[in-house]
Amino acid sequence: MYLAELGGGTSLRAAVCSAVLDPRGPLFNDPREILEEELRRPGTYFSLLEELARGERRMESLTGALRVSHSALGPYLNELARMQLVEKRAPLTARRDMRYRLRDGFLRFWFRFVFPFQESLRAGAPLGDHYDAEIAPALADHVAPVFEGLCRRWALREMGGRVTRVGPWWGRSLDSLRATGERSGEEIDVVGSARSKVTLVGECKWTTGRMSPRALTDLEQFKLPALRQAGARFPAAGPEIALFSKSGFKDSLVDLAAGRDDIRLVDVDDVAAGLEVGQRHLEGRGVERQS
């Protein structure tokens, strides 16, 4: 629905400026009007959604930012979850260390780049300047979680029965590295499992530069050991590795992957083609899916 409002044949910058940032545009105030009709005390909800628009948050982070107690914030999160706007999820293979995230991509965009600036935009702030200063530098960071979700869906489609559950994982770094302060926490964008074993791990890069071997080194040297330390089980041969990149791969990484049977390099076109071909098949499999 929202994409249709942006229209075709124009640049993203021009479309966002006219449809979303312009106070006369169809999407400038649409989320506010809809949510104000649905929610009591919308101000508190809006503050919460603004915080979540910047990324997933633990409860402690939310209560600290909003200066409220767990018990006071809980009903607001529950109501947003009931409306399917917010969800709570744990790292795959674990049931603790829960995070909350804003599910709708446009609401994430609106509460991050429009809502905090509505007063100045109404006062006549130049739309192009706002886009260049606030949106363009953060756009890759904003889009990255969407790309990661698509990569997880791709994994379900392409890995067949070798992956029946997929999601992100986060947890503590190796105890030895935490003790020295070298590293504190690790995150893996794509973790796939089947029959209680981790069969796939993947890293996703939505950047303008090509992915380097450093991504693989970090995964194998730091992240996989941390995942094992957290109690994950692996097949005897270890998990397969998928590396996803918006901008392709450096030749050194291509050469490295060519010499190993357990590594697959996946670019944006591969992800798009896999999802387009497999969408109906995926929906009919009935597997558990986490994006």
Question: Can you name each region flagged by the protein language model?
Answer:
Residues 30-41, 61:
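Short amphipathic alpha-helical boundary/capping segments
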Residues 92, 98, 103-291:
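A cross-kingdom feature that marks ATP-driven nucleic-acid transaction machinery
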Residues 1-33:
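Amphipathic alpha-helical "lid/sensor" segments that cap RecA-like P-loop NTPase cores
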Residues 81-92:
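A short, conserved structural fragment
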Residues 67-82:
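Short amphipathic alpha-helical interaction segments
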Residues 42-53, 152:
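Hydrophobic residues on short alpha-helical segments
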Residues 55-65:
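Short acidic, hydrophobic short linear motifs in intrinsically disordered regions
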